[in-house]
Structure formats: structure tokens, C-alpha cells
Curated annotation (Swiss-Prot):
It comes from Candida albicans (strain SC5314 / ATCC MYA-2876) (Yeast). Specifically deglycosylates the denatured form of N-linked glycoproteins in the cytoplasm and assists their proteasome-mediated degradation. Cleaves the beta-aspartyl-glucosamine (GlcNAc) of the glycan and the amide side chain of Asn, converting Asn to Asp. Prefers proteins containing high-mannose over those bearing complex type oligosaccharides. Can recognize misfolded proteins in the endoplasmic reticulum that are exported to the cytosol to be destroyed and deglycosylate them, while it has no activity toward native proteins. It is found in: Cytoplasm. Belongs to the transglutaminase-like superfamily. PNGase family. This is Peptide-N(4)-(N-acetyl-beta-glucosaminyl)asparagine amidase. GO terms for molecular function: metal ion binding; peptide-N4-(N-acetyl-beta-glucosaminyl)asparagine amidase activity. Its EC number is 3.5.1.52. Binds 1 zinc ion per subunit. GO terms for cellular component: cytoplasm. The keyword Metal-binding applies. Substrate binds at residue 252.
């Protein structure tokens, strides 16, 4: 008589090891599919052709933007040296004592205080630049824009250092003097100039935010640049206590109000894309209510956008896997263990956070109750300007 087959007892199964094996197998499968899908010549050519489309080109140009705020310790140190840390932490202490929201932890309160300090004490909004002769900006008229190479006030080398994208030309009606206003993208330069519109505000704010909460290791991924096709940018940070990405708008000094733009400004939007270190993600469902949704296909082919996001994320995962592998090679472990550790790191740092967020962004899960405390309409910018952009709360 054949003896019955005994199932392994629970004590003989190493569930931790089994779990790791499943994670490694899943990550291997994802990377293999990425290699097959995105390293082929057909997909490379498809991606290259799509970059001829303006919206696709804009999205791709931002795919590596977070690197701007990371990895340069001297720039992060300069950010901390430039801001008034004693004032920030003094106010933070008051926030801690008066805070009644149990969902806000120390990091969250620090971000709130930085938001307040940055808007009210550090950075200045520019409707029109001040006239260097009379000091007024009340009677300054915009005349258009020029390339940095045509500037009469900024050298080409300085324009490159400051990452000047374009230079606005204005004229003071009182003095008849031409005024150049360079649109600066270098966040380190902005620590000194401390003025601009939403692009400058977000660039400078994110460098300081990274310096304060970003962490010093390669695995840290807590700040995100958020781009809107209809000419606005803002940012998010990952809250360790809430375990989610939280909306921040430094221009408005607003925290965790994703429906600010649709419900308070009355802004109609098509696409909202987020860019953090590990991946890019379509955040449109988080920020756009159905009645303010500009049909995406009226702007750009939705499938093309989805392909570019998937392609960029897939290539990014492969690059990061190689980087992690190289780091593991410095450890005194065998080659197989090095690869397995790299697979596990990729699983925890990339695949789990991305998949979790994708699930959280399902339309039925992203409904947010707008704050009744927020004023109607955009607060930064002149009345005429916000009205012309459909952001004054009347539409």
C-alpha cells in the first residue's frame, strides 16, 4: 500500500523566502517584457516619430526633470543656507503645538510651514518686471519674446548657466525704456533672483523641498513635478504618514487641494502629468472633474500619450536596474545574490509604488471634497491675466 503523501507542515515552509522568490519572478517578468517591448527597433522608431508632436515632446522633455533637484549636494546645501531656517523651525514649533489634525505628522507640518514661508517671505510674483529707471511696473507693457541669443542684457554663457528658455521684452510707458525679463529655469539661480511666475516658483520651491525632506540616498523619491497642458505647473510630495502623494501649489500657498484648479479657478484642462524620480504618471483623473475635462483626444491621441508614458517608464526601470546592479557589485556577495537583491529593490522602489498609485487614481477613488475655505479664482497674477486664461473662477 502506497503511503499517503504528506503536505509540508507550516513550520517547514519559509514563507518569507517564498514571498521573495515570487517578487523576484514578477520583477524579472516585467523587465523581460520591457526589453522585448521597448528595445526593439520598431518601438524606438515609433517613439522617435511621436516626439514630433508638440504635446508628446513637452511630456518627454520633462521625463528627467527631477534630476535637476537631486544628487548635487552643494546645490542642496546652498538652498538650506539661503532660506531662513530659524524662522521656519520657530513657526514649525508653533504649528506642532496648535495642530489638531492627527493625520499630519512632523514632515507634513514642515512642508506646510515651508509653503507659507516661501509664498509670504521668500519669493515674489511678477506680473510685469520693474522698470530699472523709475522702479515702477504699473505702466509696463509686454512686447513679445526673444531668444536668449538676441538679448542685449544677458550674455549667452550666463543664459546657459541660468537655463533661460526665453526672454520677455517689455516697455515702460513712462520712460520708454525696454525691459528684458528672462524666464529662468535653473533653481539655484532662482535662490538669488527670487522672482517669476509659476515655472520659477515651482522650480525654486522644489529644490528647497528636496533639501528639507528629500533624503540623501538614491532610493528616496518624495518630490514630484506636475505639468498641466493648459500652461500651469505645480508639485506634490510623498507623505510618509498618509502614504500618498499630496498636492502643493507654492504660487497659491495651497496644500492638498487637487480640485483647486477646476472648482476654484474654473479652469478647463486636458492633461495633468506627474514626474517623480522613479516614474511618470497620468494624474488627470486626480485633478480634473468631468465637467471641466477637455477631451484628451481633441488635444493629442490618447494611445500615443499612453505609449510614451509606458515607454519612458520601461526604459527608466531598465536603467535603474543596471544602476542598482552596479551598486550591489560593490558588496561582498555572489553574482546571483546581487541580481536578486537588485530585483527586490526594483520591486519595492518602482513596481509596488507605481501599481499602488495607479489603483488609487481610478476615477471612483479620486473624488475629493473641495475646501470651502479657498477663495474663488486664482490669487497669483493680475485680474486681467487670470481672466484671459479662464482662471478667475467665473467660467
Amino acid at each position: 500500500m502506497t503511503p499517503p503523501i504528506k503536505s509540508p507542515s507550516s513550520s517547514s515552509v519559509d514563507y518569507g523566502k517564498l514571498s521573495e522568490q515570487l517578487m523576484i519572478a514578477y520583477t524579472k517578468d516585467v523587465l523581460q517584457r520591457n526589453l522585448q517591448k521597448f528595445h526593439g527597433e520598431q518601438h524606438r522608431q515609433q517613439f522617435k516619430q511621436l516626439l514630433n508632436q508638440p504635446v508628446i515632446k513637452s511630456i518627454h522633455s520633462l521625463s528627467g526633470i527631477i534630476v535637476r533637484y537631486r544628487h548635487n549636494n552643494s546645490e542642496l546645501d546652498k538652498a538650506l543656507d539661503t532660506i531662513d531656517l530659524p524662522k521656519i523651525f520657530e513657526r514649525l514649533e508653533i504649528r506642532e503645538k496648535t495642530n489638531k489634525d492627527k493625520n499630519l505628522d512632523y514632515d507634513d507640518l514642515l512642508v506646510l510651514e515651508l509653503l507659507n514661508y516661501f509664498k509670504n517671505d521668500f519669493f515674489k510674483w511678477v506680473n510685469s518686471p520693474d522698470c530699472p529707471s523709475c522702479g515702477s511696473n504699473e505702466d509696463v507693457q509686454g512686447l513679445g519674446a526673444i531668444n536668449p541669443s538676441s538679448s542685449k542684457t544677458i550674455s549667452q554663457s550666463q543664459a546657459i548657466i541660468d537655463q533661460v528658455s526665453v526672454i520677455e521684452v517689455h516697455e515702460c510707458k513712462k520712460c520708454k525704456q525696454k525691459i528684458e525679463f528672462p524666464r529662468i529655469n535653473n533653481p539655484v539661480t532662482l535662490l538669488t533672483t527670487r522672482r517669476g511666475r509659476c515655472g520659477e516658483w515651482v522650480n525654486c520651491f522644489m529644490l528647497i523641498l528636496q533639501a528639507l525632506i528629500g533624503g540623501g540616498d538614491d532610493d528616496s523619491d518624495r518630490i514630484r513635478y506636475v505639468w498641466n497642458q493648459e500652461d500651469h505647473v505645480w508639485c506634490e510630495y510623498y507623505s510618509l504618514s498618509s502614504k500618498r502623494w499630496i498636492h502643493l501649489d507654492p504660487c497659491e500657498g495651497v496644500y492638498d487641494e487637487p480640485l483647486l484648479y477646476c472648482n476654484n479657478w474654473g479652469k478647463r484642462m486636458s492633461y495633468v502629468i506627474g514626474f517623480n524620480y522613479n516614474y511618470m504618471i497620468d494624474l488627470s483623473d486626480k485633478y480634473i472633474v468631468p465637467e471641466k475635462q477637455i477631451p484628451k483626444n481633441s488635444i493629442v491621441n490618447v494611445q500615443n500619450v499612453n505609449f510614451v508614458i509606458s515607454y519612458s517608464n520601461g526604459i527608466n526601470q531598465l536603467k535603474h536596474f543596471k544602476r542598482i546592479e552596479q551598486q550591489q557589485q560593490q558588496q561582498e556577495v555572489d553574482v546571483n545574490e546581487q541580481r536578486n537583491l537588485a530585483f527586490l529593490k526594483l520591486y519595492h522602489n518602482f513596481l509596488v509604488p507605481y501599481n499602488k498609485e495607479i489603483n488609487q487614481l481610478k476615477p471612483e477613488l479620486t473624488k475629493t471634497t473641495p475646501s470651502t475655505d479657498l477663495p474663488s479664482g486664482r490669487q497669483s497674477g493680475s485680474t486681467e491675466w487670470t481672466k484671459s486664461r479662464g482662471e478667475n473662477g467665473e467660467s
